Structure formats: structure tokens, C-alpha cells
Amino acid sequence: MCIRDSSDIYSALKVASAYDFVSELPHGIDTIIGERGVTLSGGQRQRIAIARALLRKPSVLVLDDSTSAVDPKVEAEILQNIKTETNCSLLVIAHRLATIRLAERVIFIDDGKVSASGSHDELLKIDDYANLVSAYEDIKL
């Protein structure tokens, strides 16, 4: 894939909430990252990975715990940006309740099988799902 315009890169960085920290790197988007360059945090690496995926302009974007190292506020911002700024469907695999609550539709998998689907609030009426949510909330206390 050939990117003809750096505006595509900047747009993807903005959607992935990575634009600000990338702009502050010594050489911006041309900064060398890794062992011989600048070291990024786990959350920064995840946001760069999301931006790279968005550059391909996918019709479906699968995020498998792709924001686990990002704080919940930034994660919500990224998911909202993807929803409003792209034309792709988003499939999110998540364990964080804050992420699950943001979803339009949740597919609850229990013992390797689809047990139920619906909104988070709808699924709270199902005992197994409600018990799982309660267990996660108890852990945070």
C-alpha cells in the first residue's frame, strides 16, 4: 500500500488518539522507535498499532484487547473516534467492563459458546452475565 499524503497518517493518528504524543517525539512521524530509538509505553504502542490498522481503511476493524494498556478515558475516546471518523465496523474483544458498556451489541460467550447477545443493559437481566459483571465489580472494590 502506498500512502501518497502524510495527511492520511495524521488523520489515523488523530483517530487513534496518538497525534499529540507523536507530534512531541524528536522527529515527529519520522522518529525511530524501538531498541535503537525512542521507547514507547504499552498504551502508546497500542495507539500506534490502531493508527497503522486504520491507514488500510478497513471495512471491519477487529480490536482484540487492543486498548488494554490505555486508560479507560483514552480508550473511550479512541472507540468514539473510530465510530464517528471512519466508515468501518468495529469488533472489539474486551475484558474491561468500561469497554463492554460502550458497545452497541455485546455477544456473551460462556464455556466457548455464544450464550446471549444484546446491549450490556439487556444482558444484565441474564443471571450468568450479571454474575460475571458482579464478580468483576467486586474485584475492583
Tell where the protein language model's regions lie, with residue ranges:
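Conserved catalytic loops of ABC-family nucleotide-binding domains
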Residues: 81-94, 100
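Helix N-cap at the start of a conserved alpha-helix in ABC-type nucleotide-binding domains
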Residues: 72-74
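A short, proline-enriched helix->beta-strand linker immediately N-terminal to the Walker B motif
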Residues: 55-59
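Short, small-residue-biased leader/transition segments that mark boundaries at the very start
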Residues: 1-3, 93
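ABC-fold ATPase nucleotide-binding domain signature/coupling loops
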Residues: 19-48, 66, 70, 105, ...
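C-terminal portion of ABC ATPase nucleotide-binding domains
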Residues: 24-28, 80, 101-141
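Catalytic Walker B motif of ABC-type/P-loop ATPase nucleotide-binding domains
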Residues: 61-64
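ABC ATPase nucleotide-binding domain helical subdomain, centered on the C-loop/LSGGQ "ABC signature"
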Residues: 4-35, 79-80, 87, 126
